[in-house]
């Protein structure tokens, strides 16, 4: 294995008690990266969860845990794996301190959060405690290496499913205990850390073999942990009123009726045996030609994890009260980590300047305001929040209401009226807007009842707009299924979509106060203005400028974002008042530009909506606007586009022709570059909001990172 980021440690500078003889110890050259992120994790824990007390984690002097156990971690990944490991230490201490029968609850919660981010791309309730920190870990890992991050998150979820599940079981034999301990030590957790840190990919067909070969190494690390943590675990057990300790030393004492010292010596012999056994395993691995280079690199890296774990453990303040921290670590603990390293959100290496084409800028935004009410940031809640009952019962006529329609008739009519809406609502959705609302509520702290109403309003309007969009655009597919009007026809679809405005208005009334209604009508107005611009250009073959295009996007796509942002600001319980207009407009521009790009290049999008659907519908998307403006005299382009108008649609061959012109002319690359800049603007807005609110929003950053990589 090639060594780029570490150096061999002089054996005279550390002690091992003979527990890793024959193994080399290496140490990372950039250990300050670990120190910064371990301390950052502790800061986040204090902010999000609570005080740490006398907590000791992965840091120490002269050796810190990740720098010596994964010495070849890529420098840009060392920080986040150190943060993740520190979070694991904090979680471990919580489950130790809690009543032992509650340990599963903590593991279940962490597992559920990892499962959520894998399956849905977000972590719900990330504004509370540990889940906010998990969202932070996931976001940073996904931003570095999406595929390996997902692999690690899946491995950690599986580990949490098994870890700590027998803490209330009194093991009778060493064999039974060791079988359990190999998994509980975090074989899969360490696998996730190590593969991500060193950018290793184990082929699927070699995964089981890899874990089997590494079992002895993980047993080694488990027993080292049992040896050095014996006093700590024994004290925790006594504090919890337990008469047993889930530790090899305790099991050996009971099984063989031996003293504590004898059991510790027995543990050392098992560790030494595991060292010899794994060295033999690795020698055999090197001679095999049926294993990939990455599998071999992983199994070799585990050697350094074994030796590093021994050296760190014997010098760690986590296990030894006389162990120390470095002067730099103590300085940062006292005064905070370097300010240049405190935020992950601002610059992303993307040029923050404007993108220009033919002197048309796409950076300017149109702030939507009306009579000074462009934001609800300084509004106060008026009214009692109750909805008026418009359909009171007429007691003299059973089964009737005062409007003369029977309840049974109303129910039937409602079912017919709602059927198209319920059809589109039942189609699979990633729920981006709902996740974004949850993330923003980390700042706004809108009461749960009002937040549910805001979500309901946005869901109703979003699905209604999709029904009308598909109908107006002639789209036959929505989320891989037949569009609503292809099932229910034009009339029923239009009627049901329009009725949703009534439902949304009824929901707005539940929020109480006139300002909610004002925000609602303003943003609904702009949403329809944006849609009309889009339809007008398509119908009349008018190619807008890029500025005009983004003005339309801010109305049409940004409208719903502004609506929920302004409603949340209006009903916020946070005393900090912030204008969400700029953020909402930037999100709208990014979201629509991404949609334009995905429509042309994404296989998944083709499956859900059809091949290059925007070209088929004649929409002026950003790539097409760029193409038409940079090739205004191209006869092939002009004639293909005119034929699409004549036919009312575009054939597969015509779409292929336009797509090829986009590739040759750089229109797709322009759109991709624009996305990078728009994402930079979005990150800048998030950073500004974090500074205004005085709190980082890991969940929001995770959502956008997944959106960028999705």
From Swiss-Prot:
Isopentenyl diphosphate binds at residues 430, 433, 462, 479. PANTHER family: GERANYLGERANYL PYROPHOSPHATE SYNTHASE (PTHR12001), THIJ_PFPI FAMILY PROTEIN (AFU_ORTHOLOGUE AFUA_3G01210)-RELATED (PTHR12001:SF72). Substrate binds at residues 92, 96, 181-184, 229-233, 318-319. One of its GO terms (molecular function) is metal ion binding. The gene is vrcA. Residues 328-709 are annotated as: Geranylgeranyl diphosphate synthase. Variecolin and its derivatives produced by employing P450 monooxygenases from other fungal terpenoid pathways exhibit anticancer activity, thus, the skeleton of variecolin could be considered a privileged scaffold for developing anticancer agents. Its EC number is 2.5.1.-, 4.2.3.-. The keyword Ribonucleoprotein does not apply. This is Bifunctional sesterterpene synthase. A motif (DDXXD motif 1) lies at residues 92-96. It comes from Aspergillus aculeatus (strain ATCC 16872 / CBS 172.66 / WB 5094). In the C-terminal section; belongs to the FPP/GGPP synthase family. In the N-terminal section; belongs to the terpene synthase family.
């Amino acid at each position: 294995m090639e060594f780029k980021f570490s150096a061999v440690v002089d054996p005279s500078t550390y002690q091992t008690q003979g527990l890793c003889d024959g193994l080399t110890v290496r140490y990372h050259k950039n250990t300050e990266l670990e120190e910064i992120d371990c301390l950052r994790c502790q800061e986040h824990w204090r902010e999000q969860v609570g005080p740490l007390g006398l907590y000791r984690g992965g840091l120490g002097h002269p050796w810190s845990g990740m720098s010596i156990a994964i010495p070849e971690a890529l420098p840009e990944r060392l920080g986040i794996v150190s943060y993740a490991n520190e979070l694991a230490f904090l979680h471990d201490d919580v489950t130790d301190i809690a009543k032992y029968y509650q340990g599963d609850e903590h593991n279940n919660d962490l597992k559920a959060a990892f499962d959520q981010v894998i399956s849905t791309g977000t972590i719900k309730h990330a504004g509370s405690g540990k889940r906010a920190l998990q969202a932070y870990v996931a976001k940073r890992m996904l931003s570095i290496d999406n595929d390996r991050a997902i692999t690690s998150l899946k491995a950690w979820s599986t580990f949490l499913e098994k870890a700590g599940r027998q803490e209330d079981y009194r093991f009778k034999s060493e064999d039974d205990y060791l079988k359990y301990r190999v998994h509980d030590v975090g074989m899969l957790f360490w696998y996730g850390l190590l593969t991500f840190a060193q950018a290793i990919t184990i082929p699927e067909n070699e995964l089981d073999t890899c874990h089997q070969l590494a079992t002895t190494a993980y047993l080694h690390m488990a027993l080292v942990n049992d040896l050095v943590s014996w006093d700590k675990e024994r004290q925790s057990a006594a504090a919890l009123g337990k008469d047993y300790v889930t530790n090899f030393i305790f099991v050996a004492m009971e099984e063989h009726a031996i003293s504590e010292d004898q059991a510790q010596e027995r543990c050392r012999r098992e560790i030494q045996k595991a060292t010899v056994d794994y060295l033999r395993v690795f020698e055999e691995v090197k001679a095999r030609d049926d294993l990939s280079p990455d599998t071999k690199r992983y199994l070799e890296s585990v050697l350094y994890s074994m030796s590093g774990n021994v050296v760190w453990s014997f010098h760690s303040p986590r296990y030894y009260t006389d162990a120390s921290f470095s002067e730099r670590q103590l300085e940062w603990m006292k005064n905070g980590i370097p300010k240049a390293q405190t935020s992950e959100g601002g610059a992303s290496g993307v040029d923050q300047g404007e993108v220009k084409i033919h002197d048309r800028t796409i950076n300017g935004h149109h702030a939507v305001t009306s009579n000074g009410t462009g934001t609800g940031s300084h509004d106060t809640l008026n009214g009692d929040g109750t909805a008026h009952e418009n359909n009171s019962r007429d007691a003299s006529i059973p089964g009737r209401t005062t409007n003369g329609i029977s309840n049974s008739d109303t129910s039937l009519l409602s079912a017919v009226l709602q059927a198209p809406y319920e059809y589109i609502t039942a189609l699979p959705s990633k729920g981006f807007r709902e996740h974004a609302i949850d993330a923003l509520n980390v700042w706004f702290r809108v009461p749960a009842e009002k937040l549910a109403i805001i979500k309901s309003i946005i869901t109703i309007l979003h699905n209604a707009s999709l029904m009308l969009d598909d109908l107006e655009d002639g789209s036959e597919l929505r989320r891989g299924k037949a569009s609503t009007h292809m099932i229910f026809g034009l009339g029923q679809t239009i009627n049901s979509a329009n009725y949703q405005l009534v439902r949304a208005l009824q929901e707005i009334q539940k929020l109480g106060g006139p300002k909610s209604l004002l925000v609602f009508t303003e943003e609904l107005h702009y949403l329809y203005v944006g849609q009309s611009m889009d339809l007008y250009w398509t119908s009349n073959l008018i190619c807008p400028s890029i500025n005009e295009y983004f003005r339309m996007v801010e109305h049409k796509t940004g409208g719903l974002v502004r609506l929920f942002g302004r409603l949340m600001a209006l009903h916020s319980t946070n005393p900090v008042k912030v204008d969400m207009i700029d953020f909402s407009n930037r999100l709208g521009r990014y979201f629509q530009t991404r949609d334009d790009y995905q429509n042309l290049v994404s296989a998944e999008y083709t499956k859900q909506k059809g091949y290059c659907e925007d070209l088929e519908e004649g929409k002026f998307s950003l790539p097409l606007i760029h193409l038409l403006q940079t090739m205004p005299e191209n006869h092939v382009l002009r004639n293909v586009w005119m034929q699409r108008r004549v036919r009312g649609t575009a054939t597969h061959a015509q779409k292929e022709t336009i797509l090829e012109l986009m590739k040759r002319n750089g229109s797709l690359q322009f759109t991709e570059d624009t996305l990078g800049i728009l994402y930079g603007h979005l990150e800048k807005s998030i950073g500004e909001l974090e500074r205004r609110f005085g709190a980082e929003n890991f969940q929001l950053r995770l959502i956008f990172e997944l959106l960028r990589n999705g």
